[in-house]
UniProtKB/Swiss-Prot annotation:
Primary location: membrane
GO biological process terms, semicolon-separated: respiratory electron transport chain; sodium ion transport; transmembrane transport
Keywords per UniProt: Cell inner membrane, Cell membrane, Flavoprotein, FMN, Ion transport, Membrane, NAD, Phosphoprotein, Sodium, Sodium transport, Translocase, Transmembrane, Transmembrane helix, Transport, Ubiquinone
NCBIfam families per record: nqrB, PRK05349.1
Source organism of this protein record: Yersinia pestis
GO cellular component: plasma membrane
Protein name: Na(+)-translocating NADH-quinone reductase subunit B
Catalysed reaction equations from the record: a ubiquinone + n Na(+)(in) + NADH + H(+) = a ubiquinol + n Na(+)(out) + NAD(+)
């Protein structure tokens, strides 16, 4: 019996009147992973396309893979030298034995010696990232199933994207219970209470991270959370620049200066998926050419960022080194690139109109640099900038629509 025949055989149990009727969303979610339903919409279909919501979300899911795999490698790349720098001999073995991440990596065949190869670094990174992703995926999926059963509608695939995006914008050392709490806030408060996928006005992944940032700042920011070596303290390059400008950009493990190319490629500490601008841009090309993300938003963010960075460069400051940061450094440090490509382009919480997308993207670019530079105590502004712009997205669309109405009325007079 083929899979399709099996699914068709049990389908009547989940349909209206069947003994498993209330679990139809679970059946529908499982069945549509492999097959597309004949009826895609319950009402009149005004736009026909070869791609549905599930396929669109899966495209975004695959697009983050380059940043995800590089992020896992970079976790090990940063952690193993730091671990061997802090400890040696019996003390090192004691530290390894006391941390389940290290033990798991060794069970998988990883070496934690100074000469560890790329595979060992990847395995250690996976030992940190995959548990976070598994917890976030299961908890986020649980809430999606609960609300789908209560509301009696199909399970929306948005949580596939939300779960992996959330997992990539947190530090690798984030406690698993906080990961579960953060995604719960993002899905329930940031999305489901407004009606679910398509009705939320905030990006749920960013809403969850913002909750953790304000509720548990010690585990989501600071100098202790970015390198996965017990007891190691190392600031991110963005934090270093805020202290003494470009001269303070130093790899806290090797002691070598950090070049722009190091930051662009992703050899710096940071959130798991935000370190490599190159990998992020590869994923961005996939979703932009796939027409899932809007190039207008990306261009608007870049224009707003470059203009504001030049403005602060022109103003200058003798007390705040961030005034002098060039725009091309803003691009590769912190969460700017990841937020611009994968967060700002969220089709639900962003502006819908073409002109509105330009203004929406521009506001994000301006606010990101404004928060970074004007608030050196928090030298990262992309998360708050996008959430702030989410609130203005409906206003931009309203202004654009009203302007179009007035212009058309004027033509008819």
């Amino acid at each position: 019996m083929g899979l399709k025949n099996f699914l068709e055989k049990i389908e009547h149990h989940f349909e209206a009147g069947g003994k498993l009727e209330k679990y139809y969303p679970l059946y529908e979610a499982a069945a549509t992973i492999f097959y597309t339903q004949g009826k895609v919409t319950p009402g009149a279909s005004h736009v026909r396309d070869a791609i549905d919501l599930k396929r669109m979300m899966i495209l975004v899911w695959f697009a983050v893979f380059p940043a995800m795999f590089w992020g896992m490698y970079n976790v090990g790349y940063q952690a193993i030298p730091a671990l061997n720098q802090l400890y040696s001999g019996a003390e090192l073995q004691q530290v390894i034995a006391g941390d389940w991440h290290y033990r798991l990596a060794q069970m998988l065949g990883a070496s934690l010696t100074p000469d560890a190869g790329w595979a060992s670094k990847m395995l250690l990174g996976a030992a940190y990232f995959l548990p976070i992703y598994a917890v976030v995926f299961l908890v986020g999926g649980f809430w999606e199933v609960v609300f789908s059963i209560v509301r009696k509608h199909e399970i929306n695939e948005g949580f596939f994207v939300t779960s992996i995006l959330f997992s990539l914008i947190v530090p690798p050392t984030l406690p698993l219970w906080q990961a579960a709490l953060g995604i719960s806030f993002g899905v329930v408060i940031g999305k489901e209470i407004f009606g679910g996928t398509g009705r939320n006005f905030l990006n749920p992944a960013l809403a969850g991270r913002a909750f953790l940032f304000f509720a548990y700042p010690a585990q989501i920011s600071g100098d202790l959370v970015w390198t996965s070596a017990d007891g190691f303290s190392g600031a991110t390059p963005l934090s270093q620049w805020s202290v003494n400008g470009s001269h303070s950009l130093v790899n806290t493990v090797s002691g070598q200066p950090i070049t722009w190319m190091d930051a662009f490629l992703g050899y710096i500490p940071g959130s798991i998926g935000e370190v490599s601008t190159l990998m992020i841009l590869i994923g961005g090309a996939i979703i932009i050419f796939g027409r899932v993300a809007s190039w207008r938003i990306v261009a608007g963010v870049m224009i707003g960022m470059i203009a504001t960075a030049y403005l602060f460069n022109w103003i200058g400051s003798t007390t705040n080194p961030l005034f002098a940061m060039p725009w091309y450094w803003h691009l590769v440090l912190g969460g700017f690139a990841f937020g611009m490509i994968f967060m700002a382009t969220d089709p639900v919480s962003a502006s819908f109109t073409n002109k509105g997308k330009w203004w929406y993207g521009g506001l994000i670019g301006v606010m990101c640099i404004l928060i970074r530079v004007a608030n050196p105590a928090y030298p990262e502004g992309m998360m708050l900038a996008i959430l702030f712009a989410n609130l203005f997205a409906p206003l931009f669309d309203y202004v654009v629509v009203q302007a179009n109405i007035k212009r058309r009325k004027a033509r008819g007079e």
